[in-house]
Design a protein with these regions (language model features):
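A short pre-motif secondary-structure segment
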Residues: 139-143
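Sigma70-family region 2
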Residues: 43, 56-71, 91
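C-terminal edge and immediately downstream basic/flexible tail or linker adjoining helix-turn-helix-like DNA-binding
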Residues: 2-3, 95-98, 124, 152-158, ...
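Internal acidic/polar
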Residues: 2-7, 94-118
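Arg/Lys-rich amphipathic alpha helix in sigma70-family domain 2
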Residues: 65-67, 78-98, 170
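Structural recognition of an alpha-helix C-terminal capping motif at a helix-to-coil junction
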Residues: 50-57, 70-82
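Conserved RNAP core-binding helix
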Residues: 27, 35, 45-62
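N-terminal module of bacterial RNA polymerase sigma factors
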Residues: 1-33, 40, 181
Length: 183
């Protein structure tokens, strides 16, 4: 993977004549990292690729709104997380599933996904995460998997650090309770 300097990408994105090149660099630089952010929220490979593609389309169409005040990855992450959450909300509206069936369907979906390389414990963890309310799920995912600092999350999600810490603590507690009840 090529490593491009954030400032170099920003500079290219700011000039109409170099935007395309800057955007190509941006896609090469951040695709994998964004894919995993999306995948942890959306769960399946195919859906994650769709959401990632929508993320880059939105980013390209919204280049004029990017002024370079934040890091490129922060801007892209915000778009990716919003796209992921929108996708999950739409899926919830489509799928009318009882509460008992919803948990096992997450595990079944993951185990059937040819790109899922986890074991049953990982599938159960994903079930537990999927059962969390949206905000707690997002905060847990960003903190646990991406090891994102609360200060970064605060900027990304426009939420206070204290609120994020509380959401993470509650999410961890709920996940622990989930595993205790599924022993």
């Amino acid at each position: 993977m090529n490593k491009y300097d954030d400032n170099q990408i920003k500079e290219l994105l700011m000039k109409p004549e170099t935007q395309r090149k800057g955007f190509e660099m941006l896609v090469r630089q951040y695709s994998e990292q964004l894919y995993w952010q999306v995948r942890r929220i959306v769960l399946t490979h195919e859906d994650s690729n769709d959401v990632l593609q929508n993320t880059f389309i939105k980013a390209w169409n919204g280049l004029s709104s990017f002024h370079g005040d934040s890091k490129v990855l922060t801007w892209l992450s915000r778009i990716a997380i919003n796209e992921s959450l929108d996708f999950v909300r739409k899926q919830k509206n489509i799928a009318v599933v009882s509460a008992d069936d919803s948990e096992s369907s997450v595990a079944n979906t993951l185990m059937a996904d040819e790109y899922f390389d986890g074991d049953e414990t990982e599938a159960q963890l994903q079930e537990a995460i999927a059962s969390l309310p949206e905000v707690q799920r997002t905060v847990f995912t960003l903190r646990y998997y991406d090891e994102m600092k609360y200060s970064e999350m605060s900027k990304l999600l426009n939420t206070s650090e204290g609120s994020l810490k509380a959401s993470y603590h509650i999410a961890v507690k709920k996940i622990s309770e989930f595993f205790k009840s599924h022993d």
